[in-house]
């Protein structure tokens, strides 16, 4: 093929590809969105209390660390999220108990009646540490996480949470510790055998609030919390 014919062929191919993409925008692959911080150095504008606007009494932000010591109102995001990847670092006090809720709604009086929970716990000293179903990184009361992955109290742990369509992954300190499918037969049977059975829309929302549990005793600190939306 001579050079003129080669240029003409390449031009035709590129024009055809552009026209195809324009006619079928859904065919163009879209990746994850950009990472976005959910915490500033001295404020938490992306969060509010479950019961009240703004940051409830007992929660504090300093040096990019969100913390509480003792029972306080739960926190929820101002914005709802459907498919996302969430990363954060957390440390908990001795016998501390907290959690990260996802796809929560305001249908019920507490977020935990609608939202699955990634458990944050001092496994060695909190009562919930006696069962893997309620230990650190478990999908609370539904899917257990293995022992020996969480670090002791007052040490920083790294969490990654992936929620896409019905697929959920819990990661702890670089290790995938829980994976499950929302609305699957297995998931439904576990919910039916749990305390969440009384709440028919538990875990069914396709998008909702992210929450941080504050109503249990003990100290909790969160830093480097960021999120990106997934296609």
Annotate the PLM regions:
Residues 8-18:
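Bacterial N-terminal signal peptides
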